[in-house]
């Protein structure tokens, strides 16, 4: 299994990310296109979320109406 991304690698160029697709799901339930974008959102915006797993987040819909 892959380790979570090392956000220190992206510190010098936050928000100057490529369009490479390597999706990450954050613990906030939001999908990020790649580790650079994930780290940028987490670092610069001081958000309270962490790495969830590699791949897109699954959207859960409630069966209740």
UniProtKB/Swiss-Prot annotation:
Tissue specificity, per the record, is: Seminal plasma.
Membrane spanning stretches:
none
Q: Which SMART domains match?
A: KAZAL (SM00280)
Sugar-modified residues: 12, 62
Q: Which GO terms describe its molecular function?
A: serine-type endopeptidase inhibitor activity
Chief location of this protein within or outside the cell: secreted
Q: Which InterPro entries match?
A: Kazal_dom, Kazal_dom_sf
Which cysteines are cross-linked by disulfides? 7-39, 17-36, 25-57
According to its record, what are the GO cellular component terms?
A: extracellular region
Q: Which SUPFAM superfamilies match?
A: Kazal-type serine protease inhibitors (SSF100895)
- Protein origin, superkingdom: Eukaryota
Question: What PTM annotation applies here?
Answer: The identity of the O-linked saccharides are not reported in Ref.1. The O-linked polysaccharides on Ser-12 and Ser-62 are probably the mucin type linked to GalNAc.
Please state where this protein is localized: Secreted
The UniProt entry, under Pfam families, shows: Kazal_1
Chain ranges of the Kazal-like domain: 1-59
Q: Which UniProt keywords apply?
A: Disulfide bond, Glycoprotein, Protease inhibitor, Secreted, Serine protease inhibitor
Annotated site residue numbers, Reactive bond:
19-20
Under the heading PANTHER family, the entry gives: SERINE PROTEASE INHIBITOR, SERINE PROTEASE INHIBITOR KAZAL-TYPE 11-RELATED
| Role of this protein | Inhibits acrosin.
Q: What is this protein called?
A: Seminal plasma acrosin inhibitor A1
